[in-house]
Amino acid sequence: MVSVRRRALKAANFKAVEEHIRVGKPVIGIRTANHAFSLRGLEPPKGHLVWENFDAEVWGGSYTGHHGANKAVKIQKLSDHPILEGIDVDTFKGRGSLYIVKPIA
């Protein structure tokens, strides 16, 4: 599971993550995993590695930023999706911002 934001990993840890992914083992990403190992072009500390194209190469995405935080996220269009079972989609309010990820593979 990848749940980090803009981190350079120690080389040994990076190689373990990279090998896990490259051999086709499963990987799950949580929100900021889009830019998990990107330092926006900055040099990583000595002995650390980055993966600037992680988003495109692993997730098939293209993270370009995020929308501003709104007071609510409407989910009515997905009301019949199994993941929303038991959720009142008419009153649900999510807080936070949504990522801009286009195109999605």
Describe each model-derived feature in a short phrase.
Residues 1-5:
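Cell-envelope and extracellular/periplasmic
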Residues 6-89:
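A glycine-rich, often tryptophan-bearing local segment used as a flexible ligand/cofactor-contacting loop or short
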Residues 86-105:
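Active-site oxyanion/phosphate-handling segment shared across diverse enzymes
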